């Protein structure tokens, strides 16, 4: 159901997106605030697919690796992790010169490998990224997530603590953990739930309100692009 006062704006956004146009920053802000009830999973995937296509096109036009990184982040959010992998592996080594860029590529590629289920490869990319930019929280959150998915809960929690020390918010870390739980099988679900409640029953009280989600999709992005 669409509220009358939202109808015109929502239809305008949908028409432009359907016509292959990018949404403006104001459009996205509206969809994430006042219009959040209409920003469904399917709608979000269409938005990220459009953004991925734009940045991939910009990469082909400019050869700027940052466009490939941005495109890959959006590909992850519309279940196209393989497209992201292919794009990232196409970046010539000679264009990966600055440490910050190389870390961003490694972190993004690690997230892609995580989406595809190649956790050891994701771990390697995260380790590379952390070595390149040890003060950046993003490689730390990636390593935290991957270690949790590998069953290394203490190690994963240590990496999340390092991420928090470097600026990651408690909310973003908890969103990461929530996503991991929702993608876990029953056995791992129970293990992670028990670990978190044992570690800090107050902070992780929200775990008790979640219910196992049986379906998982290779190539589907997690809620947070680590």
Feature annotation, model-predicted:
Residues 4-39, 60-77, 100-111, 174-176:
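Amphipathic alpha-helical repeat scaffolds of TPR domains
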Residues 48, 55-56, 88, 126, ...:
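Hydrophobic/aromatic packing residues within the alpha-helices of TPR/SEL1-like helical repeat arrays
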Residues 50, 83, 121, 155, ...:
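Alpha-helical positions within canonical tetratricopeptide repeat
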Residues 51-62, 91-100:
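Flexible helix-coil transition and linker loops at the boundaries of alpha-helical arrays
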Residues 62, 88, 94-96, 133, ...:
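Alpha-helical junction/boundary sensor with strong preference for TPR arrays
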Residues 68-133, 138, 142, 149:
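Alpha-helical adaptor scaffolds
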Residues 96-102, 135-140, 165-178, 203-209:
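Boundary/linker segments of alpha-helical solenoid repeat arrays
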Residues 148, 153-171, 178-185, 192-203:
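TPR/TPR-like (Sel1-like) alpha-helical repeat modules
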